[in-house]
Swiss-Prot record:
Keyword Nucleotide-binding: yes
Residue sites binding ATP per the record: 626-633
InterPro entries tied to this protein: DNA_mismatch_repair_MutS (IPR005748), DNA_mismatch_repair_MutS-lik_N (IPR007695), DNA_mismatch_repair_MutS/MSH (IPR017261), DNA_mismatch_repair_MutS_C (IPR000432), DNA_mismatch_repair_MutS_clamp (IPR007861), DNA_mismatch_repair_MutS_core (IPR007696), DNA_mismatch_repair_MutS_N (IPR016151), DNA_mismatch_repair_MutS_sf (IPR036187)
Protein function: This protein is involved in the repair of mismatches in DNA. It is possible that it carries out the mismatch recognition step. This protein has a weak ATPase activity.
Pfam families attached to this UniProt entry: MutS_I, MutS_II, MutS_III, MutS_IV, MutS_V
A GO molecular-function annotation: damaged DNA binding
Protein name: DNA mismatch repair protein MutS
Family: Belongs to the DNA mismatch repair MutS family.
Amino acid sequence: MPEIAQPTPMMRQYLETKARYPDALLFFRLGDFYELFFEDALTASEALQITLTARAKGDDKVPMCGVPHHAARGYVARLLEKGFKVAICDQVEEPGKSAIVKREVTRVVTPGMVFDDQVLDPREASYLGVVALAEGRAGLALLDASTGQLQCGEVPDDARAVDELRRAGVRELVLPLGADAARAERIERAVGVPAARRPAADYERADDRLRRHLGVASLDGFGVGGEPLGLAAAAAALAYLADTQRATPRHVDRVSRLRTEDVLLLDEATRTNLELERTLNGGRKKGSLLALLDRSVTAPGGRRLAEWLRYPLTELAPIHARLDAVEELAGASVAREDLAAALRPVADAERLLSRLVLGQGNARDLRALAGALLALPALAELLGGRAAALLRDAGEGTRGLEELAAHLDRAVAEEPPATLREGGIIRRGFSPELDEIVAVAEDGKGFIARLEAREKERTGIGSLKVRFNKVFGYYLEVTKANLHAVPSDYERRQTTVGGERFVTPELKRFEETVLTAEERRIAVEGRLFEELRQRVAEAAPRIRTAADAVATADALLALARVAAERGYCRPEVDGSEVLEIVDGRHPVVEAVLPEGPAGFVPNDVLVASRGALECERLGALHVITGPNMAGKSTVMRQAALVTLLAQMGAFVPARKARVGIVDRIFTRVGASDDLARGRSTFMVEMTETAAILHNATRRSLVVLDEIGRGTSTFDGVSIAWAVAEHLHDQVGCRTLFATHYHELQDLARERPAVRNLTVAVREVGDRVVFLRKLVQGGASRSYGIEVAKLAGLPAEVLARAREILKNLEALEVDEGGHAALARGRKTRRADPQSQLGLFAPAPAPADPALEEIASALRATEIDALRPLDALNLLAAWRAKLR
C-alpha cells in the first residue's frame, strides 16, 4: 500500500477502498471521471494507452490517469480482454450533503463476471469455472452469471477437470486457497485463463448454503445430491458472484448436474481438429461448423445451439426427440417462417433478467423484457399445435407471464432514457402521484401566469407581479401605491424601495411543489422502478423457464433451416456399433464449393466395431492411403462430423446415414507444436495418440491421420503399425487410419477386420487428376512430387526430386515395392554396400563397351558353346575393355 505523508480526506478514502481490493484495478469516481492512482494508474495507462499524469500534494506526486464515466464500459471491456479485474467505486450520495462524498464499490467486473451487453458476445456463454479439490478427485461448477445457469458435478481426475473446463470455454477460474498449491497451479496453467483464489469458507457447508439460497429442503430434486465436491464448487461460485456484484444472485434459482455421463466426450484436440467453433487457421468463427449451423433468430437460441454442439448426446430418447422436431420443421417451410417471425421480437430475457435482479439493469432493460414477454403468447400458440413433443413443450414453457408482460408494458415508457435522473421512464397514466408531479414540473410557467391573473382580478391591483429570486423564492410584488388593496391573507416577506413583497398559502404550496418537483419526480420514478424490478425478480423462475423454452425452439429451428436448405437427411441413430454413411459430405467444405461437377464429391464410410455382427462385412479399421491433397483428411473429418451431428440431434449431410451410438470421438489430424510448453510437433502428436490409446473404448470412433510422420521413416512406420495393431486387437473400435506408409496395407493380410481403402487418382499424361473418391484397395504412390509441382516448387528442384525418388524406388526389395512388415513373410534385402545415399550425386553414364558386352552376353546361348568358343569370347570382351 502506498504511503502519503498527509493524505487528503479523498485520498484517505481511496487508500482504504483500494486496501480491500488489492487484486483489482480500482475505478474511483471523481465527478465525471473514473480515476486510477499509484500502481493502478501505471498499469491502466499502459494497457489502455491513455495519458499518465500526476496529482501533486506538497512533496508527494501521485501517478494518476482517468477515463470519462460515460465511456467507462469500453475501457473496462479492454481491460477484461487483457485479463484484469476492475473494481467500480461509485459516488453513492449527491455532492454537497457531507464534507466528503460517500463512495462504495458497487461491483467488481472480472472476466467471468460480466453483465454488460456491450462487452458480452450475445451468442456465447460466459462461464466462470470453479474447482474444489480432494484426494484423487475434483469437483467442478460452471456458472454463467449473465444468465443464471449453474451446473456442478465431480470428475475422477485433474486431467478430466481441465478438459471439461476447456470444453465449456470458461473465461475465469476460481481455485481454493490453502489447497495443494502445486496441483492448483497445474490446473490453472492447463486451463489458461485468469484465476482467483478464494478462502476455504466459500466451499464449506455447501449443501446447507445451497438449500437456503434455492429455498428448498433437499437438493435431490435437482439431481445433484451425492457429489459433495461438486456442491462445494457450486457454493463457492455463488459466493464469488455475490461478493463481486454486491447483491444476492436471486436469478440463480436452480442448479443442474454437470453433464459428464450422458454426453459424447470430445477432448480438446478433437474439438480443435474438427473446427467445431473456431477454425484452425486464425481461430475465427467464420468457417467453423457452428457458424454454418447457427441459423437461429435469437441470441439465446445461438447459445443453446453451441451448447448442443459441445455436448452431443449418448441417450437415444432425447436424440430422437430432437430429430422428430427438426424433421417436422424441416418439412414445413411456412411453419419455419412463422416460427422465425414469432421469435424475432423476443429479446435476450435471460441476460436482461440477470442485470435487473442484480441491480445493474435500467429502464431500457425493463422495456426490452416487456417486449420479449409480450411476444410469448403468439409463440406459445404457434408451438402448441405442433406434433413434435419438444416443440409443444417449448410452447407450454412460454406461458404464464401474460400478466407481468401487461403490467410492465403499462408501466414503462416506450423509449425510456438510460438513467433515472433524466426522468421519463414511467408511462403517463400509470401512477396518479407521478402524473401530478410531472404536470406541475412541466406546467410551472402556466400556473404562475394563471395565478397572477387571478390575483390581479381579486385585488384589483393591475400592476401586481409574481416574481422569483433564489433568496425568497416565489413572491407577489405590490407597489406602494397599491398597498391599501392588499388582502388580509397576504403575508409580508420584504419591504423594498418601490413597494413590498408578499406570499400566500397557495404560492407557498406551489413553490414547494415546483422547486422539489424534479427531485420528487426522480424519487417517485426510482421507487416505481424498484417496485417493477422486484416484481421481475419474484417472477425470475418463470422468466428463466420461458427463456429456456425460447432457446430450445430457436435451436431446433436453426437445425431445421440448415437441413432443409442444404439437403441433409435424418440419420438412423441406434444402439449398434455401426457407422454407415452413404454419399456423405463435409458440411463446411461443401458449403464453400460451387454446385455441379466442380462441387463436393460425396463418399461412403462403412465401418463397425470388432465383435459387431456387421464387422465381417464392413471391417473395424480402415487403412486409407492415397495422394496428398486427394481428400483423405476431409473424408475422415466428415465421418466424425456426421457422427457428432447425428448425436446432437441434427440432420446430416449424406444421402443415408446409420450411426450406432459413440461414447467418444478422438481425432489426431494435422500437426502443430507447443513451444510454450516445450513440446515438439512429434511430442504433441504422440501425447494425443497416447490419450487415445488409453481412453478409447469399443464404442469410440477414432480418426488418425499420418501417425508417426514427425520422426524418421522406420520409427514412424513402426509406431504407426503398433498403434494400428493395438486399436484393432485391444480396443476394437471403429477406426479410420490415414497414412502415407504404404507398408500398413499389409495389416489386412493378417488382421481380419482391417480394410484397405484409397482415394482414387487418374494420370492424364504427366498430369495427375484427384478424383476425391474413396475406393477399395491400396495406393502404391503418394504423388508428392505432383503436389509439390502444383504448389509451385522450382522446376530444377522438382527434377532433382524425381531423380532421388528413382534412386529410392530402385532399392525397394519386395514384390509390393516396399518393405514387408507382416509376420511370416519372406523378404529380400538389398546389398547394403550397393545402396546409394539419399542425396548422393546422380550415377555416371554407363560405359558403351560394357553395354555392348552385356548385350552380347544376354544373346549368347551358353549351353551350346564349346570351351574354346567361350575362351575366345572372353578374350574379345577383355580386349574391348582395354
